[in-house]
């Protein structure tokens, strides 16, 4: 399965790159798809990156995301995900940040997943859920990169976790 999603963000590429790359391990601070996140101490840090990967608490369980490619110059990185449901045998995501006009950026996600036989049967349902999650993720990234504030959904999640 392959998914491609992108969004235009009204913030310069350096600002957006800082959020998605330099604050890679802090995704749990603004994305409601991630209850909490932190650096993956087992991952080697690529040149230019602040961490080698992250560990995310999600509805799927704890996921480890580790950089497999990273380019500050091209504002592009790829990470591999482990800890997915057992029917997913490989998951990786390539994130690219490009200029999209004056003081604007385009963030592209290119996700590749390989599945076993059970995964092929479950793929249509999983694709619907993942598409919804990715749309919310990109909308929340846009809000956070443009304003520095988290979505109402994430605010509720953080308040519930603090209670």
Located regions from the model:
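Short acidic/polar mixed-charge low-complexity motifs
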Residues: 1, 59-63, 89, 103
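Hydrophobic ligand-binding cavity/cleft-lining segments
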Residues: 1-46, 162-163
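Hydrophobic/aromatic beta-strand elements that line small-molecule binding cavities or substrate pockets
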Residues: 5-7, 64-69, 91-99
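A structural signal for well-ordered alpha-helical scaffolds and beta->alpha junctions
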Residues: 13, 20, 60, 127, ...
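A short, structured loop/turn motif at beta-sheet edges
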Residues: 13-14, 69-74, 96-106
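Glycine-rich portal/gate segments that line the openings of hydrophobic small-molecule binding cavities
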Residues: 28, 38-86, 136, 140-147, ...
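Beta-strand/loop substructures that line and gate deep hydrophobic ligand-binding cavities in soluble
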Residues: 82-136, 143, 152-154
């Amino acid at each position: 399965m392959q998914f491609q999603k992108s969004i235009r963000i009204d913030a310069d590429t350096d600002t957006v790159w800082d959020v998605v790359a330099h604050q890679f391990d802090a995704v749990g601070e603004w994305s409601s798809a991630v209850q909490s996140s932190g650096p993956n101490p087992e991952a080697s840090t690529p040149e230019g990156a602040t961490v080698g990967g992250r560990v995310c608490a999600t509805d799927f369980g704890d996921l480890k995301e580790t950089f497999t490619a990273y380019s500050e110059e091209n504002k592009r990185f790829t990470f591999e995900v482990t800890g997915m449901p057992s029917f997913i045998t490989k998951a990786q995501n390539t994130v690219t940040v490009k200029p999209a006009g004056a003081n604007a950026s385009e963030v592209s996600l290119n996700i590749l997943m390989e599945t076993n036989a059970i995964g092929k049967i479950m793929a249509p349902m999983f694709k619907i859920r993942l598409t919804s999650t990715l749309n919310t993720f990109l909308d929340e990234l846009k809000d956070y990169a443009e304003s520095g504030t988290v979505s109402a959904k994430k605010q509720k999640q953080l308040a519930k976790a603090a209670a």
